[in-house]
Amino acid sequence: MAKNKGLLIAMAVIVIAVIIYFSTQQSKVSKTGVGGEIKMGIILGFTGPIESLTPAMAASAELAFKEASDSGSLLGGATISPMRADSTCVDSAAATAAAEGLISGGVAAIMGADCSGVTGAIATNVAVPNGVVMISPSATSPGLTTLDDKGIFFRTAPSDARGGQILADITKDRGINSVAITYTNNDYGKGLADVYEAAVKAHGITVSTVTAHEDGKADYSSEAATLASAGGDALAVIGYLDQGGKGVIQASLDAGSFDTFILSDGMIGQSIIDAIGSDLNKSFGSLPGSTGKGAGVFAEVAKTAGIDSSGPYTGESYDAAALIVLACLLYTSPSPRDCL
């Protein structure tokens, strides 16, 4: 109950903050299209190390926008037209260019980005300078908490400052006495690895090594060999399921060095189950989410819309888009052009 209450309070604070920001923008040149159309940006890693996760995330956000449009209640019957862009998850320059394309296209707000590094780059270099509200459903780096965002960047996912502690608690509960840690070499990986390492050590668990890996390589046998030489009851893989993280796991299995893997949120999804199969039977991980009534309602709505909501951050993507819509609904304006 306390967790649910805290979440509701946090969501309310976000809505209020977004509304306050929007209400200061009435004199700005409109960013919406003609004929009651409001353009909204969706920027996620449609290519790259989490490309198997983002289609459902984008579809969930678009579902919220569609519901608002179909209701006829959005600012006198205005409709929302989503515009997609590719963050790549890992290439900040490409992500920034993609976000600039959304701004040029006239979006009023941005749902995204996904991975923490590109999210910070887009917020700092594009969203904040242009005064465009941005809500990420999945950027979890603790560093984003102190981002100089001028009050227009928000998240619907919890920080890894908490996520790393929870993953460490699960590790202890599973009876693991020693771990090797590998992390994707970016803000998300390093931030979560630091929190997780400190938390497992606080539980009395030995950390044999902490090493970074790069995404997009064809071979991870060298990384697997380094981790194998350090040893441990399990290998904690803090990374992405479609590239580096998967590669390290497969190389470790091929070498016979580990058979138990501890997975961060970026490692959880159907594609890695399809790729690795039963060799993951001893493995476990953690994923932010909710088990409350709202989660069940969303799952049913998503299913009806043909969206698989079982993957990470689908609900958070819907929530991020819905928060933008709610801010529009609650902001009294004579024209849809003044909404955002």
Positions of predicted regions on the chain:
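Short, low-complexity disordered leader/linker segments with a strong preference
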Residues: 1-39, 70
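Sec-exported extracytoplasmic/periplasmic mature domains
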Residues: 62, 66-73, 100-108, 124-131, ...
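Hydrophobic alpha-helical segments within soluble ligand-binding/sensing domains
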Residues: 94-95, 155-178, 191, 219-221, ...
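Extracytoplasmic ligand/sensor domains, especially the bilobed periplasmic-binding protein
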Residues: 104-212, 260-285
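Conserved small/polar residues in nucleotide/adenosyl-binding loops
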Residues: 331-340
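Extracytoplasmic "Venus flytrap"
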Residues: 41-62, 85-92, 114, 182-190, ...
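Beta-alpha junction/loop-to-helix N-cap segments that form part of ligand/metal-binding clefts
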Residues: 29, 33, 37, 52-59, ...
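Extracellular/periplasmic periplasmic-binding protein-like sensory domains
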Residues: 251-321, 328-329
